[in-house]
């Protein structure tokens, strides 16, 4: 593994690494891996392929991605969806995504906070993908009832859905369940796709038009690691989220969870 670019951005140190043997590229920010992909920009992260597979089921054609990283999901969706919009606070992410991860220049990119972008826009989407992190945490304001209601107001009323990536360190980490609980204040249909028993995993919280969604399959295999991705997708399962959280004041905009 070699470092092919290193820079200090407003949001911390960024490193782009390359595996010489397999021609794989990795985007690391402040010590956390944000993206990993093959030379064609196809992601090596199973949760990205899960999101891609779920979007295919709802035939989403107009999609907003909040959070760019290396932009591998945008690269993959750019080949199929009619309109992709990506929002990220870090302008360097877009340059890196285009230079190393194959993000098409035709994809609309905005340097902005996801919530502020939605407040300034009247557009409604088929799907909104939330994959934004400060270090290893979802930004606090994106973990609120007000934020979810804002997202809901920008989704197509009949087919729109939210898909959110929520990191879990282990089975006792309640972050995915907390996120689902807060989301349920804005949507009637909220589901959780997870892999129990895996340390340091990505769970997906789904809300909106998600009742008919099935477990996703690998649709766009990368040049390597396809079997590993398929194995992890096969282990994913929808599970009941633990609804034992109470909001102190759901209308306040804060997370306000009583655990």
Task: Outline where the language-model segments fall.
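General small-molecule cofactor/ligand-binding pocket signal
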Residues: 17, 108-110, 191-193
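Flexible loop residues that form catalytic
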Residues: 133, 194-195, 210
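Short catalytic-loop micro-motif centered on adjacent basic/acidic residues
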Residues: 163-165, 192
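Conserved S-adenosyl-L-methionine
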Residues: 187-198
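A short, structured beta-strand/loop element
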Residues: 21-36
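N-terminal cap/recognition module
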Residues: 32-46
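SAM/dcSAM-binding transferase cores
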Residues: 2-18, 34-38, 53-56, 198-259
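The AdoMet/dcAdoMet-binding core of the Class I SAM-like
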Residues: 6, 21, 42-163, 170-180, ...
């Amino acid at each position: 593994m070699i470092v092919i670019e290193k820079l200090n951005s407003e949001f911390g140190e960024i490193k782009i690494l390359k595996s010489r043997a397999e021609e794989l590229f990795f985007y690391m920010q402040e010590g956390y891996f944000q993206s990993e992909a093959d030379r064609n920009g196809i992601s090596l992260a199973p949760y990205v392929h899960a999101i891609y597979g779920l979007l295919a089921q709802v035939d989403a054609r107009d999609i907003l991605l909040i959070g760019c990283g290396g932009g591998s999901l945008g690269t993959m969706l750019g080949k199929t969806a009619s309109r992709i919009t990506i929002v990220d606070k870090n302008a360097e992410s877009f340059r890196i995504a285009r230079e190393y991860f194959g993000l098409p220049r035709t994809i609309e990119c905005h340097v902005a906070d996801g919530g502020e972008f939605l407040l300034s826009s009247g557009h409604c989407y088929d799907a909104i993908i939330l994959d934004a992190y400060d270090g290893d945490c979802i930004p606090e304001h994106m973990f609120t009832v007000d934020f979810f209601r804002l997202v809901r107001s920008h989704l197509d009323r009949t087919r729109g859905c939210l898909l959110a990536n929520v990191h879990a360190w282990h089975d006792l980490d309640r972050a995915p369940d907390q996120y689902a609980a807060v989301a349920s204040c804005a949507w009637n249909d909220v589901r959780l796709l997870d892999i129990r028993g895996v340390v340091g995993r990505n769970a997906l919280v789904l809300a909106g038009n998600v009742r008919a969604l099935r477990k996703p399959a690998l649709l766009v295999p990368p040049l390597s690691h396809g079997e590993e991705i398929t194995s992890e997708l096969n282990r994913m399962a929808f599970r009941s989220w633990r609804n034992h959280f109470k909001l102190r004041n759901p209308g306040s905009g804060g997370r306000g969870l009583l655990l």
